[in-house]
């Protein structure tokens, strides 16, 4: 009996991978363009069709580039809080935030900074973080797998729309 060329581990690339090269390249080209035509893609399909694998491959490709920051969020948790925590934990950005005397201690991120007013709204905190990502000429890819219609997703989508309107490099 021969081994099954497919995998039941969601998101893990199977031995027999059905490449979505055209679609993957279209998304990568769009995201990497000087002026992106799209900053959001929703990958849909039937169960087992390779949505998570495709998303993982796109994230992997962008992670290899120095001008990209890639974070993965869990849709069952507070996405804005998780995003702030993940951005804050990136050593290069963490140092930028401390040097800029940004106090995110109200969210359990880092330490209180003397003579700095604490940021008390998570959306404002993320906007400050995104400004520093923009100043450092980087782009931020956020991937969320298995999205459902939940309050966390609706809040995140509303904030994401605001970030897009403010021209932050968020994808």
What are these regions (language model features)?
Residues 130, 157-167:
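Conserved catalytic/switch belt of AAA+ P-loop NTPases
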Residues 23-29, 124-128, 155:
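Well-ordered alpha-helical segments embedded in enzymatic catalytic cores
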Residues 1-41, 89, 139:
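A short, basic N-terminal segment
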């Amino acid at each position: 009996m021969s081994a099954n060329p497919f995998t039941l581990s969601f998101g893990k690339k199977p031995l027999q991978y059905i490449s979505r090269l055209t679609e993957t390249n279209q998304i990568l080209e769009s995201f990497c363009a000087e002026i992106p035509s799209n900053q959001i893609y929703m990958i849909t399909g039937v169960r087992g069709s390779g949505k998570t694998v495709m998303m993982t491959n796109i994230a992997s490709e962008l992670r290899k580039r120095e001008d990209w920051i890639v974070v993965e969020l869990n849709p069952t948790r507070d996405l804005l809080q998780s995003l702030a925590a993940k951005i804050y934990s990136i050593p290069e950005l963490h140092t930028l935030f401390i040097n800029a005397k940004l106090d995110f201690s109200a969210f359990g991120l880092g330490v209180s900074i003397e003579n700095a007013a604490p940021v008390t709204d998570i959306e404002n905190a993320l906007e400050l973080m995104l400004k520093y990502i923009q100043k450092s000429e980087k782009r931020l890819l956020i991937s969320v797998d298995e999205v459902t219609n939940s309050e966390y997703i609706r809040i995140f989508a509303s904030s994401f729309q605001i970030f897009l309107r403010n021209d932050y490099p968020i994808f």
